[in-house]
């Protein structure tokens, strides 16, 4: 039985990375405990305000954000923290060598109905040690990530992590309060018959995405010649976890529903860390044309379309978009 601490001692590239990952995952234990208490801890319901994204915050959104922010601010290796919930990045320790970005509680609309939610995190190098970190320091492409992962709070609490060339999973043992290794080399099959998409936005999609979904719905009677099933958790962390466990496709494509937004999901807090996990598990991740991990960010709250999962389906969607005259 291998614990997270034992794994990090042998795999983490530096003591600093080891320590920051430990800080994030320790906070995950606290969030997991709060979620199990639910209404008994008075953490359900609305917080009464909105985040920088214009979304109504849940009480646990705010609490999870504050727990992570406070813990990382006390970590000497962390130079700065950026959260999906806050307008600007928060400087931490000027001598730190790492930057941490996180979505404190992905899928928070699921909290009050007792469905899966999670914490997504990304760790980047900090290049200006000795100086106070700024928003611009976080504007690095996803291919620069030193580590990425998520904590899924479901029937059990699962940590999925990548710090080398592979993806591993740990389960939080409620008896010992340790993360215990359960999967050492997560791999996604190239082919799949499952897809996750919010089909209510169909009329807002570009023609290539409409064509793709039409083909899947036609199933064995259409050009694909086989049937597909829809799965939708309404939390990216839940859908990505299912894909890492048994393959599949997840997409939140470009749409015209909100003309001023390039996509629904955030590049820095969601798309980049999840894309790194998916690619290192032999899957693919694109905005329908470009590799997500190669996108050069211009804002810490930048949004992008996302298509990720089983590689053959991701490649096919990209081909449909590249071959379409109105891309």
UniProtKB/Swiss-Prot annotation:
Q: What is its EC number?
A: 3.1.3.11
Name the residues that bind Mg(2+) 2. 103, 106, 270
> Which residues are Mg(2+) 1-binding?
84, 103, 105
**Predominant localisation class:** cytoplasm
| Pathway given in the UniProt record | Carbohydrate biosynthesis; gluconeogenesis
Cofactor(s) the record lists:
Mg(2+)
Q: Which GO terms describe its biological process?
A: fructose 1,6-bisphosphate metabolic process; fructose 6-phosphate metabolic process; fructose metabolic process; gluconeogenesis; sucrose biosynthetic process
Entry binding sites for substrate: 106-109, 198, 264
Q: Name one Pfam family in it.
A: FBPase
Q: Report the CDD domains cross-referenced here.
A: FBPase
- Going by the entry's taxonomy, the superkingdom of the source organism is recorded as Bacteria
Tell me which UniProt keywords the record has, alphabetically: Carbohydrate metabolism, Cytoplasm, Hydrolase, Magnesium, Metal-binding
Gene Ontology terms for molecular function = fructose 1,6-bisphosphate 1-phosphatase activity; magnesium ion binding
Instruction: State what protein this is by name.
Output: Fructose-1,6-bisphosphatase class 1
Q: Which organism is it from?
A: Psychrobacter cryohalolentis (strain ATCC BAA-1226 / DSM 17306 / VKM B-2378 / K5)
Q: What is the lineage of its organism?
A: Bacteria, Pseudomonadati, Pseudomonadota, Gammaproteobacteria, Moraxellales
């Amino acid at each position: 039985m291998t614990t997270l601490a034992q794994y990090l001692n042998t795999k983490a590239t530096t003591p600093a990375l080891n320590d920051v990952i430990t800080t994030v995952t320790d906070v995950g234990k606290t969030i997991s405990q709060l979620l199990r208490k639910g209404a008994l801890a008075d953490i359900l319901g609305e917080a009464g305000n909105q985040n920088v994204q214009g979304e109504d915050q849940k009480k646990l959104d705010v609490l999870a954000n504050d727990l992570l922010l406070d813990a990382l601010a006390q970590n000497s290796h962390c130079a700065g923290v950026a959260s999906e919930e806050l307008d600007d990045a928060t400087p931490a320790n000027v001598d730190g060598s790492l930057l941490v970005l996180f979505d404190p509680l992905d899928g928070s609309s699921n909290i009050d109905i007792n469905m899966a939610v999670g914490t997504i995190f990304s760790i980047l190098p900090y290049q200006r040690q000795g100086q106070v970190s700024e928003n611009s320091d976080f504007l690095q492409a996803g291919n620069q990530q030193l580590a990425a992962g998520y904590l899924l709070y479901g029937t059990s609490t699962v940590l999925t992590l990548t710090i080398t060339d592979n993806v591993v999973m740990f389960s939080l043992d409620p008896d010992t309060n340790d993360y215990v290794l359960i999967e050492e080399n997560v791999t996604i099959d190239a082919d799949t018959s499952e897809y996750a998409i919010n089909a209510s936005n169909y009329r807002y999609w570009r023609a290539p995405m409409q064509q793709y979904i039409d083909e899947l719905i036609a199933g064995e009677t259409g050009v694909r010649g086989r049937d597909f099933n829809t799965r939708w958790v309404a939390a990216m962390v839940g859908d990505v976890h299912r894909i890492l466990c048994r393959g599949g496709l997840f997409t939140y494509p470009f749409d015209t529903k909100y003309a001023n937004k390039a996509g629904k999901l955030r590049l820095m807090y969601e798309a980049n860390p999840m894309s790194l996990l998916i690619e290192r598990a032999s899957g693919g991740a694109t905005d329908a044309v470009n590799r997500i991990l190669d996108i050069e960010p211009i804002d810490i709250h930048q949004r992008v379309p996302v298509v990720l999962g089983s590689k053959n389906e991701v490649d096919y969607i990209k081909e449909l978009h590249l071959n379409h005259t109105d891309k």
